[in-house]
């Protein structure tokens, strides 16, 4: 069979499933990522290779660029759909998760990597930094709904805002791991540069450029003379341009682009909070995100089925994976929410649903290309196993748990979605 034609056929099926599967799965204890990985496994058994078995150990640059792009698209979407204006008090639950849960998770996972896997300081820190952030791509089912739909309870808000910011805020820890690995030891020579550049400058630049990008793009979209406003086009394609501009502008001045994209999206919302155009931007971005996610997870499933990474899984790797998902994240999340005033059930759900995903692959690929890490194959195997378990366990649990949350709020999860500007046809479905 002609491999090119076969590839087009498979891509056509995947694109069609991108639109149809969320509708088909809306009442089932399954998620779109589970189906994508299963499709990748099935395709790996085919006599031709319609999609690559993208072993990241063999091509870290490809893994880095693909995951980087889908993450920034997801970050823009996450920022656009948060209705709650940023603030110290209104975002208290977010600051707790970022300031307590994430550093605690990094420390505990690094400790597991050092004590159980026998990793050195740099590799253990990299493992913790890569796995601590929750994922904005695979966590769509536990996030808030589209802009101005009223689907923003505290649980969904916490998981959305946390995923939007912690991908960028974990970058300093990745850079610390790179610095230690580059000097072949945990000495203090790197510390001053790390604090001044990787922590202070890059975080400051990320926030500042994100705010500036959001203000400029918001002005062009909503505030220029009416005939020239981007919002008048009604074209959601602009979301992709906003994403690329805010990310690249920040990276050019050596800031953290992940932080900038999310901040830019929040700022854009604040420029004209109730415009229906935010819905158009969000919907287009979500479609692109879903398509890219499906393609990457199909490749992920194909790589798993190929077996070279899973062959490295032993009881140590399995133990670290289980402890990370069952103990580390729930414990860190719960500790961070002590005294927050939330009910125990809410704290439990927020603590458990810290989904790991494509952001972890990005960080590992990026770091692997910057410095030589010992036993990097074991790190990759551990991360892949944790992503697989997280996708399956959280994917099975998310539908009944989110339905319970909506029932507690007195909301029908399957109702049509309404925006302030009018009705959006169709049903709310699991993404």
Sequence positions of predicted segments:
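Transmembrane helical cores of multi-pass secondary ion antiporters/exchangers
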Residues: 1-431
